[in-house]
Swiss-Prot record:
Record localization: Cell membrane
Lineage: Bacteria, Bacillati, Cyanobacteriota, Cyanophyceae, Synechococcales
GO molecular function (one): symporter activity
Protein known as: Uncharacterized symporter sll1374
Residues that span the membrane, as ranges: 31-51, 52-72, 84-104, 116-136, 162-182, 191-211, 230-250, 257-277, 318-338, 356-376, 383-403, 407-427, 450-470, 501-521
Coiled coil stretches, renumbered: none
GO cellular component, one term: plasma membrane
Membrane topology annotation: Multi-pass membrane protein
One matching Pfam family: MFS_2
SUPFAM superfamilies in the record: MFS general substrate transporter
UniProt source species: Synechocystis sp. (strain ATCC 27184 / PCC 6803 / Kazusa)
Signal peptide: none
UniProt similarity note: Belongs to the sodium:galactoside symporter (TC 2.A.2) family.
Length: 544
């Protein structure tokens, strides 16, 4: 017999380990989206148009490799499953190339020659990092529909994922703020140390997820006996790191009090301790075990890419999800990439305060994530998206009107923006497993990797063009790039207008598009229940 629609519940430790898998990609992506453009223009000294081109080329290459990795992941056959081997194999180069993004090599004493050398270097590193990012993150995202087919449980699972994602984003900003405070007026060293620490945290969290999770009907990477032996060691190591941080903070080891190193040790200790805790309690759910005579789930179809694209475009619900996701994340990342310029050049605040404003956004998003998750038990996903986006659009209107000196209003608007940002995290990714189910009903095949890859592909192409246009607009508006080692220059009025337009009206335009698409999204709770019932009936008939 197949699992009933109310079954396929996941243990708390499984959800926790799954959530940890998005911690590493989230903290790397968060620092990149908030500070990479600023780093390239104001620390490395690259003109804004070239800096925007670095981001565009990296993202377009990233978009190209998404469907390739998705198809390869779908077709992977191993005793551990289709997704976990990719996560495990890609995490080390992922961390190494991330660290390399924050280095500033010297190519020539001639300023123009050095700028072009840096441009080529950062393009190459961006392409390599984005390939590694896809290798670990895309198979991870495709795990959601494989771990459970329960409508509400998928939303809960994504709540854990985005709790780690938003929580990690918040913690990465705190780490940046502490590093900036500990290393004032040394931006190159700030970003260099930040890159190393973020990389270590990312590898640790990815290991936690890949080694604790088990794919449906497959062997775990760590045997039960090895899990039992490792659990107390990891927990002890985590506690030791936290105690070291506490001792350093209270000057018991000759330290300088609580600083970014203490905070880093605490984060690393929590990851290792959480890893050990989930290994200690790691009983496998019944529906994930390989049982005799159990019906097989849909298998991946070995079709050419163009034919798969044709099938994807024939799935009307999928097109809506792509549009909603693209609009939401263009709004998120356009605002994030320009925020530091807005805070410094328009509001007259320092770079460090851009981190605290971003914290207000993401802290609110983290809290609201659980509020929306609770409401999702009663409301359709598109209703939740509509409510959050309306609040968000109001905040964007306020950002256009806020004036220098109105700092309290700026933080208030950041909090309201966080209410909407949380739905951009939660809702599109909760919709896509339902689309995969609909595709299986129509085709008899499960192609999670392809759908997740193609969804992200379009998002990245759109984002690449958006970020390139931001850089190009800044350059055309007369934006003055900071010379390394010099104070931040005063921008002309034309550049200030371009910064304000990119931080408020432009994201609001994309949010409006997402709202319109959400209204017509066809898969409601009742429709999804009917899809799952038809799939279960088909599986039972095939088994008979």
């Amino acid at each position: 017999m197949s699992q009933s629609l109310s079954a396929e519940k996941l243990h708390f430790t499984t959800k926790l380990a799954y959530g940890a898998g998005d911690f590493g990609p989230a903290i790397t992506a968060n620092i990149l989206v908030f500070y990479l453009l600023f780093f390239l223009t104001d620390v490395a000294g690259i003109p804004a148009a070239l800096a925007g081109s670095v981001l565009m080329i990296g993202k377009i290459f990233d978009a190209i490799n998404d469907p390739i990795i998705g198809l390869l992941s779908d077709r992977t056959r191993s005793r551990w499953g289709r997704r976990l081997p990719w996560m495990l194999g890609g995490m080390i180069p992922f961390a190494l190339f991330y660290t390399a993004q924050w280095l500033i090599p010297h190519f020539s004493d001639d300023r123009l020659t050095n700028q072009w050398g840096l441009f080529i270097y950062y393009v190459a590193i961006a392409m390599a990092f984005n390939l590694c990012y896809t290798t670990v993150n895309l198979p991870y995202t495709a795990l959601t529909p494989e771990l459970t087919q329960n409508y509400n449980e998928r939303t809960r699972l994504n709540s854990f994922r985005f709790a780690f994602s938003i929580g990690g984003s918040i913690l990465s900003l705190i780490l940046y703020i502490l590093i900036a405070a500990g290393l004032p007026d040394r931006p190159q060293q700030q970003f260099g140390e930040l890159g190393v620490m973020i990389s270590v945290l990312s590898i640790s969290a990815l290991l936690w997820s890949a080694l604790r999770l088990q794919e449906k009907g497959k062997e775990p990477i760590l045997s039960p006996s090895l899990r039992r032996r490792l659990a107390p060691l990891l927990m002890a190591a985590g506690i030791t790191l936290i105690l070291l941080a506490i001792a350093k903070s209270f000057n018991l080891l000759g330290g300088s009090g609580f600083d970014y190193i203490s905070f880093f040790l605490i984060l690393l200790g929590l990851i290792w301790g959480g890893f050990g805790f989930t290994l200690r309690d790691s009983a496998v759910e019944e529906h994930l075990q390989k049982l005799e005579n159990s019906p097989s789930p849909g298998v991946t179809e070995n079709l050419p890419l163009l034919k798969q694209l044709k099938i994807a475009f024939s799935n009307r619900a999928f097109l809506f999800v792509i549009g909603i996701y693209l609009c939401s994340w263009l709004a998120v990342q356009l605002t994030a990439s320009i925020l530091v310029y807005f805070v410094v050049s328009w509001m007259g605040l320092n770079e460090q305060q851009s981190g605290t404003i971003a914290l207000a956004v993401q802290g609110t998003a983290l809290v609201m994530l659980f509020v929306w998750q609770a409401l999702a038990q009663f409301l359709d996903k598109k209703v939740i998206y509509f409510l959050g986006s309306m609040v968000w659009m109001g905040a964007e209107a306020g950002l256009w009107l806020v004036q220098p000196g109105q700092v309290a209003l700026l933080y208030t608007l950041a909090i309201f923006a966080g209410v909407g940002v949380s739905v951009a995290y939660l809702i599109p990714w909760s919709m896509i497993p339902d689309v995969v189910d609909l595709d299986e009903l129509n085709t008899g095949k499960r192609r999670e990797g392809f759908f997740y890859a193609f969804m992200v592909l379009l998002q990245k192409v759109g984002l690449a063009l958006g970020l390139f246009l931001v850089g190009l607009t800044l350059e055309a508006s007369g934006f003055i790039a900071r010379i390394p080692g010099e104070p931040i220059p005063i921008q002309p009025d034309s550049a200030l207008w371009a910064i304000r337009f990119a931080v408020a009206p432009l994201p609001a335009f994309f949010l409006l598009g997402g709202l319109i698409l959400a209204i017509f999204y066809p898969i409601t709770r009742a429709v999804h229940t009917d899809i799952r019932q038809q799939l279960q009936a088909r599986q039972q008939n095939n088994h008979i």
